[in-house]
């Protein structure tokens, strides 16, 4: 996969993570407390600056009560 497409995908995942947090009425501090990840790491994912690995994705989805497909851009919209 070309680097440009990979970066764009990470940004889309980050945008969806941010929207899922808003929908769950959860800020970075709360999500960090539930998952054990730092607020800085969560921000890096939101901004698309860090790759989100499957184990991290599952933990975030569990805390946010969303399906992984919602963050992985497999749906057109986050409902």
Model-derived segments and spans:
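Short, charged recognition helix plus adjacent turn
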Residues: 1-8, 44, 72-79
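Residue-level detection of the helix-turn-helix DNA-binding "recognition helix"
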Residues: 22, 36, 47-49, 76
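Short alpha-helical DNA-recognition segment
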Residues: 25-44
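DNA major-groove recognition helix of helix-turn-helix/homeodomain DNA-binding modules
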Residues: 55-70
